[in-house]
């Protein structure tokens, strides 16, 4: 299993728009075979950092999702929404592997 961790720098004045964006992506990742672990929005501390975590069985499965999402109308609508609302300033993507006890 591989877990994609996204760290977003968001516009804190557009938090509601970012939450809408997040809710768009959760079912999309799951439709493409991923397991979404949720978005984590600012509560205390920095008001412009948000996280998202989702997993795929392998990096190859993730790459298939990335390729298919480029051609999916709902995914493109989510990207367009983020562009139009400018709720995301920047983001970085990391891949992690879980360790269980």
Each model region followed by its residue ranges:
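Short, structured motif recognition centered on aromatic/hydrophobic residues
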Residues: 2-7, 18, 29, 50-53
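Short acidic/glycine-enriched loop/turn segments that link adjacent beta-strands
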Residues: 45-48
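An amphipathic, aromatic/His-enriched active-site/gating alpha helix that lines ligand/cofactor pockets
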Residues: 20-37, 55-92
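Short beta-strand-to-loop capping motifs
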Residues: 7-12, 54-58
């Amino acid at each position: 299993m591989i877990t994609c961790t996204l760290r977003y720098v968001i516009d804190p004045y557009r938090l509601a728009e970012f939450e809408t964006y997040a809710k768009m992506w959760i079912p999309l990742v799951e439709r493409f075979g991923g397991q979404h672990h949720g978005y984590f929005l600012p509560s205390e501390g920095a008001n412009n950092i948000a996280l998202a975590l989702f997993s795929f069985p392998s990096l190859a499965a993730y790459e298939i999702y990335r390729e298919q999402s480029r051609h999916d109308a709902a995914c493109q609508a989510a990207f367009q929404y983020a562009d139009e609302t400018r709720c995301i300033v920047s983001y970085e993507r990391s891949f992690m592997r879980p360790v269980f006890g």
